């Protein structure tokens, strides 16, 4: 098991039975990637951009080379009910001369142009690796622009080398607080909630909102899927925050609790079990008896309606083996539960940004001998998928080529996908995709 693993990586790979080093100390996580390990993680800047990008009327100016802007251009498949300017990416396109002499003037001109041509009211300015090296003062530029135009121009100091993708999440959360805080007036909307950490991929936010509306809960603000500057500025009025993507938004929930007294709970709307539990927990947290009764009725009806559908596909999937490699721990946990419902054994599971408590739950849910990895690289994924004879890999766009090269089925569960996988509707889409991929006749041609 350890032959092809870098010595520095051994503590980040365990089995559900024992630690890879044999000392039983558990998994090493929440650390910077090992140099030379070819991590699948993205950079700090990317972490910040993916959280802020779905704000529908925000403008994003990337201060750096054009490649940084291209890398994250329209990176999430987020849908909008309003403006779609967020799908644009603006860059200062720094060249060698600008790196030598500084790019502050270019950034100032870029902000001026975005305001003049587009009437921007909210601008995020990102510092990339090059800017971190040459020391352009983006904070001063943003302060001057804010005073000049009387709009929000918010600096996001996110050089890729300054930490992990998780650090980018925190920087994005701090930027969101700068949008919300000026509108805080101490008032509350009783029984209302904010949804944090859902990015409205393929309209998933609207699915979740639909469930909550059916049971009588008002959604105050969504952060950041289908959000706008105006809706974000009402976020401090909510009575409860629910956190879907814990990795990217728990920090924001904690800040809102500390500063404005808004409690939060973590939820997951992936799979029948987690969707039902989340709806019930939200209803109980709101504390209204009528809401709780409606939640119980909704979850029972939806779960029962899916049973015949699941029974149809389960015989084709029982006994198959799955590998999981996703961004956050909450998604991996939900996927394991979904596979358990279908009779599929999870033999390999890893995340890019999972926390110790996530891995503890993953270990409890996993069968004996399951390989658990933090911040895995392609070589490790290949080694353990072949060793465990996985039939399908659930991951993102970077893992797709690896699966196909190994002759393994693949399911895209990352933010590039074009169909909803959340909620009860998402269960149908997920099971159908798993069945189509894992039972495709093409695999018979590879034997």
Roles of regions detected by a PLM:
Residues 1-447:
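An N-terminal assembly and electron-transfer interface module characteristic of large anaerobic redox
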